[in-house]
């Protein structure tokens, strides 16, 4: 099978519990062209992370987590104590949790490196300026895959800065994995003021509100 050896997976989320045993350092035989402390040092001041803080680079944690940075606070603390959620730990674990003895929990690509980019602010919510700064650094760090389980509303944009960043991704070989969207404004043909699609115009583009009944869509 495929264990993820040589892959770099960026997780833009609430940060992670870096001391979790499933994120322990990878042994040398699991590494192939890895991100190293030196490779990040070499480009540190070209990264948005490096430009946002006067502190010396402390983004390297171990061979499993070669880059950790909190883009919301411009520091190196990516613990859940700031964002108040372990969502990022969960997502990172699904993607690349190490296989450890005595545990059945293992990621899809356990031999991959994780690039941890905390973008959520205290109390929840992530600003697009913060997200875009992290995404631009993904390109410079030459990651293979970016996961964005952000829960933002679905839709389209023509904001120049956002379009520019997205175009950089299109020009690269990076695979972007984005949540389908938790909600949106279904303005076309919906019930006035209720944001619910009519039967002849069903919502098929979202996996959350309003296509699925939940606490966020009490009215069906």
Each model region followed by its residue ranges:
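Substrate-binding/specificity loop regions of serine endopeptidase catalytic domains
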Residues: 81, 151-220
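Subtilisin-like serine protease catalytic core
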Residues: 1-128, 141-144, 170-173, 186-188, ...
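Short, solvent-exposed loop/turn segments at secondary-structure boundaries
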Residues: 126-129, 157-159
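Alpha-helical scaffolding within the catalytic cores
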Residues: 129-134, 213
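Short, well-structured alpha-helical segments in soluble
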Residues: 133-142
């Amino acid at each position: 099978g495929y264990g993820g050896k040589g892959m770099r997976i960026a997780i833009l989320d609430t940060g992670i519990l870096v001391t979790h045993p499933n994120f322990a350092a990878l042994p040398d035989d699991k590494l192939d062209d890895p991100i190293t402390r030196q490779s990040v040092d070499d480009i540190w001041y070209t990264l948005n992370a490096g430009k946002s803080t006067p502190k010396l680079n402390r983004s390297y944690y171990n061979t499993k987590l070669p880059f950790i940075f909190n883009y919301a606070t411009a520091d190196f603390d990516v613990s859940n104590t700031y964002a108040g959620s372990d969502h990022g730990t969960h997502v990172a674990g699904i993607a690349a949790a190490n296989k450890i003895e005595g545990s059945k929990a293992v990621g899809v690509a356990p031999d991959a490196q994780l690039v941890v980019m905390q973008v959520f602010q205290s109390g929840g919510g992530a600003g697009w300026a913060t997200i875009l700064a992290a995404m631009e650094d993904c390109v410079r760090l030459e990651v293979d895959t970016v996961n964005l389980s952000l829960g933002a509303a679905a839709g389209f944009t023509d904001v120049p800065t956002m379009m520019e960043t997205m175009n950089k991704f299109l020009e690269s070989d990076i695979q972007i994995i984005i949540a389908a969207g938790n909600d949106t404004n279904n303005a076309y043909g919906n019930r006035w003021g209720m944001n619910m699609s009519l039967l002849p115009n069903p919502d098929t583009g979202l996996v959350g509100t309003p296509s699925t009944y939940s606490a966020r869509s009490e009215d069906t």
